[in-house]
């Protein structure tokens, strides 16, 4: 099944709707332009 991001609990299989769980603990939308350092293809379970 899909992984979930603690910030919004949206399934990460729905790429455009899920958030990026950065190593810093900050989560951002996959379409986020402000935090481009966050991966848009890999999601961390936190």
Curated annotation (Swiss-Prot):
Record PROSITE patterns: I_CONOTOXIN
Coiled coil residues, start to end: none
Post-translational modification: The natural D-Phe-44 form of the peptide is more potent than the L-Phe-44 form.
Location of 4-hydroxyproline modifications: 2, 11, 29
Modified residues (D-phenylalanine): 44
Tissues/organs with expression: Expressed by the venom duct.
UniProt key word Secreted: yes
Disulfide topology: 5-19, 12-22, 18-27, 21-38
Domain of life, per lineage: Eukaryota
Pfam families: Toxin_19
An example molecular function term from Gene Ontology annotations: sodium channel regulator activity
Gene3D superfamilies on file: 4.10.40.80
Localization per Swiss-Prot or TrEMBL: Secreted
GO CC, any one term: extracellular region
Keywords of the record: D-amino acid, Disulfide bond, Hydroxylation, Ion channel impairing toxin, Neurotoxin, Secreted, Toxin, Voltage-gated sodium channel impairing toxin
Keyword hit for Secreted: yes
Homology family: Belongs to the conotoxin I1 superfamily.
Leftover remarks: Negative results: does not have effect on sodium channels Nav1.1/SCN1A, Nav1.3/SCN3A, Nav1.4/SCN4A, Nav1.5/SCN5A and on potassium channels Kv7.2/KCNQ2, Kv7.3/KCNQ3, Kv1.2/KCNA2, Kv1.3/KCNA3, Kv1.4/KCNA4, Kv1.5/KCNA5 and Kv1.6/KCNA6.
Function recorded in the entry: Iota-conotoxins bind to voltage-gated sodium channels and act as agonists by shifting the voltage-dependence of activation to more hyperpolarized levels. This toxin acts on Nav1.6/SCN8A > Nav1.2/SCN2A > Nav1.7/SCN9A sodium channels. Produces general excitatory symptoms upon intracorporeal injection and repetitive action potentials in the frog cutaneous pectoris muscle. Natural peptide (with D-Phe) is active on nerve, but not on muscle. Synthetic peptide (with L-Phe) is not active on both nerve and muscle.
Domain notes: The cysteine framework is XI (C-C-CC-CC-C-C).
Name this polypeptide is given: Iota-conotoxin RXIA
